[in-house]
């Protein structure tokens, strides 16, 4: 298939295997969910009654006081007691094999093309590390909420873009499925597009 390069009017030929697949919503959902789950910290920890400090001595005798029987001051029903079903650190990672991940990425890119959310440009580099220069370039493309994909993120582009809201600049190595679906547009340079095609085609 052929994609139009915005600004030049030329076309670029890309593989149907990478950019013209059917949208597999279930697979994309699974991969996106797994990616987000893997990013969870998972360090929450609480103490059970056996882990809370103290409580070794019986607070009062079993019978004769008129009070409810108690064996430890660290019972879950007591203030400062342990937690009944205490949360423990856990790993939320879900297994997604390489074949599934690539298929999901092909599916996402194909859907971006169908929805006309993939914008191909010759390059996104700016001459100076000024936000004004970068926003002018975005304005020319008619985008305000976008993921910018470049083969290599140059220093000027990185500095000029980092203070712009709703815009993220990545190189191809930093590409992930969540970012692709999170932004309204995905602006990709021709060298980056070729690299993505090589990865997915």
UniProtKB/Swiss-Prot annotation:
Belongs to the universal ribosomal protein uL4 family. Part of the 50S ribosomal subunit. The gene is rplD. Residues 39-70 are annotated as: Disordered. This is Large ribosomal subunit protein uL4. GO terms for biological process: translation. It holds the Pfam family Ribosomal_L4. One of its GO terms (cellular component) is ribonucleoprotein complex. The lineage of its organism: Bacteria, Pseudomonadati, Pseudomonadota, Gammaproteobacteria, Pseudomonadales. InterPro entries: Ribosomal_uL4, Ribosomal_uL4-like, Ribosomal_uL4_dom_sf. It comes from the Bacteria. Keywords: Ribonucleoprotein, Ribosomal protein, RNA-binding, rRNA-binding. One of the primary rRNA binding proteins, this protein initially binds near the 5'-end of the 23S rRNA. It is important during the early stages of 50S assembly. It makes multiple contacts with different domains of the 23S rRNA in the assembled 50S subunit and ribosome. Forms part of the polypeptide exit tunnel. Coiled coil: none annotated. The keyword Ribosomal protein applies. Gene3D superfamilies: 3.40.1370.10. It comes from Marinobacter nauticus (strain ATCC 700491 / DSM 11845 / VT8) (Marinobacter aquaeolei). One of its GO terms (molecular function) is rRNA binding. NCBIfam families: rplD_bact.
